Amino acid sequence: MSAAPRIGILGAGGRMGRILIQAVQQAGYQLGAAVVRPESTLIGADAGELAGIGSIGVKLTGSLAEVLEDCDVVIDFSTPAATSEHLKLCREAGVAIVIGTTGMSDEQKAELDETAKHIPVVYAANYSVGVNVSIKLLELAAKVFGDTVDIEVIEAHHRHKVDAPSGTALMMGEAIADTLGRNLKEVAVYGREGHTGPRDRQTIGFETIRGGDIVGEHTVMFIGEGERVEVTHKATNRMNFAAGAVRAAAWVVGREARKYDMKDVLGLNDVQV
């Protein structure tokens, strides 16, 4: 790996893509490529000017295949369909990939797992350092409380977010379920209305809020008799997500082919709970 890895940004024309370009520059790494949709009117524009940091000499392109040779690793915050295509191209080129795309189907996740047998892949629903530390705290709380509490996950995002619950909320739920030896698909309850009957303590509840410009807020409640513990993470801007993804990209270059997550990047798997 070179001292300054060449990082490509996929979905560079979107809000997150522009922040990722800023994050690459702030970290002192090299922007290898910036890719937008093939039909985008932004093709040919300078990526730095688009991101508001001035000209950097990297032009936006609509073809990942044409610029992969300029990248040691790419960061993908696009759509599930686009990510599937990007995985194929990266596998063929032997280029590592960091994926922040949410809303992927089980079939698409299986494609990701297969690709990770051939190239290093980092996949996380949330690249914030704070969120990943929060998940470690959730594992500790779940281990201590066990079956003595009711568990609820509440998440809030801006009105434009199209998937619910958020990938981060599901990631939190999965961490708790795994710690308790449960299958999240079997115990998750999404919203409640009407006559629901008494709450089953084995379930993990999810509630979703959408409105305004909320960047991202997640609270997990461990509710017992006479006391309640809450673990909350609130994001006030998106740079923390971008900085974490760039950190993951620099970390994964040169690693062996397999699937990693932010706990690997941050060394949290070595922290015992």
UniProtKB/Swiss-Prot annotation:
Q: Does the keyword NAD belong to this entry?
A: yes
**Residue sites binding (S)-2,3,4,5-tetrahydrodipicolinate per the record:** H158, G167, T168
What is the name of the protein in this document?
Answer: 4-hydroxy-tetrahydrodipicolinate reductase
Biological process, per Gene Ontology: diaminopimelate biosynthetic process; lysine biosynthetic process via diaminopimelate
* Similarity comment text for this entry: Belongs to the DapB family.
User: CDD domains, from UniProt?
Assistant: DHDPR_N (cd02274)
Report residues binding NADP(+).
R37
Which EC number applies?
1.17.1.8
Spell out the subcellular localization from the entry: Cytoplasm
Question: What are the positions of the active site?
Answer: H157, K161
* Known function: Catalyzes the conversion of 4-hydroxy-tetrahydrodipicolinate (HTPA) to tetrahydrodipicolinate.
Q: Which PROSITE patterns match?
A: DAPB
Q: Which NCBIfam families does the record associate with it?
A: dapB
Catalysed reaction equations from the record: (S)-2,3,4,5-tetrahydrodipicolinate + NAD(+) + H2O = (2S,4S)-4-hydroxy-2,3,4,5-tetrahydrodipicolinate + NADH + H(+); (S)-2,3,4,5-tetrahydrodipicolinate + NADP(+) + H2O = (2S,4S)-4-hydroxy-2,3,4,5-tetrahydrodipicolinate + NADPH + H(+)
Q: Which residues bind NAD(+)?
A: G11, A12, G13, G14, R15, M16, G100, T101, T102, A124, A125, N126, Y127
Query: Which keywords belong to this entry?
Result: Amino-acid biosynthesis, Cytoplasm, Diaminopimelate biosynthesis, Lysine biosynthesis, NAD, NADP, Oxidoreductase
Q: Which PANTHER family match?
A: 4-HYDROXY-TETRAHYDRODIPICOLINATE REDUCTASE 1, CHLOROPLASTIC-RELATED, DIHYDRODIPICOLINATE REDUCTASE
Give the pathway annotation: Amino-acid biosynthesis; L-lysine biosynthesis via DAP pathway; (S)-tetrahydrodipicolinate from L-aspartate: step 4/4
Q: How is this protein annotated for GO cellular component?
A: cytosol
Q: Does the keyword Amino-acid biosynthesis apply?
A: yes
> What InterPro entries does the annotation carry?
DapB_C, DapB_N, DapB_N_CS, DHDPR_bac, NAD(P)-bd_dom_sf
Give the chief site where it resides. cytoplasm
Q: Which GO terms describe its molecular function?
A: 4-hydroxy-tetrahydrodipicolinate reductase; NAD binding; NADP binding; oxidoreductase activity, acting on CH or CH2 groups, NAD or NADP as acceptor
Q: Which gene encodes it?
A: dapB
